Amino acid sequence: VFAPGVDHHVYLYELSGNFVKGWDVPKSDNDIVSKIYHFRVDGKDYLVYADQYRLYILDRKGKERVKVSTLLNLSGNTPLYLTRQNGQMKIAFSDVNGEIVLVDFRGRVERVKGEKMVGGGILNVEDINGDGQDEFVYSRKDMLCVYDVQGKLLLEKCWENAELSFPYVYRFSARDSRIGVMDGKGERLFLLDMKDVSKGFPIRGNSPFSITFGDKGNAGFYLFAGSDGTHLLKYRVLR
């Protein structure tokens, strides 16, 4: 269990509560603003996390494996993603200005600035169109956008006065992935592909939702969501 401390050290415990022997107890320069992630790339293990200004890439013992010299500017609760771009594995995240930052496992940094992407949004990274490369799914207030690695705008949707949540991705098949997002203000749930909102949506609901495949004679996809804090809603998804 990884435990970042107020002293900026990262401690590692066994489930018994004892310290893990051999752990180097690394220290960040500032408060850590991400979770601590384990990525495995080309047979090597990487432990990755960030503070407000730096990205740390360590080995399994807590020693620096890759040095990232470029200074960053990150907000609290920044998610980090492992992504494949042009056949190369990279770490992706967004900074306070809304730029997408890509860091490879040699410590090299590149930035992607998407049209209409500004600070304060929420980023997800998934292969939406099935081309083998991840796209960047970005929600902010009433706007949902999808960008490619060059920052080209592939999809834009805007719902007036909405307050959109994290943009989840649901995979129905190898060629059918869709984005699901909640409008917390309007208590609506949206599901859409790279062209338009799916048939029958938006639907009522005010929680993140799950989509599962039915069994025992109930073949098809079903959506489960909360409503009013006390009800569970079940919908059948028409493809």
Label the model's feature ranges.
Residues 1-239:
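Extracytoplasmic/lumenal domain signature
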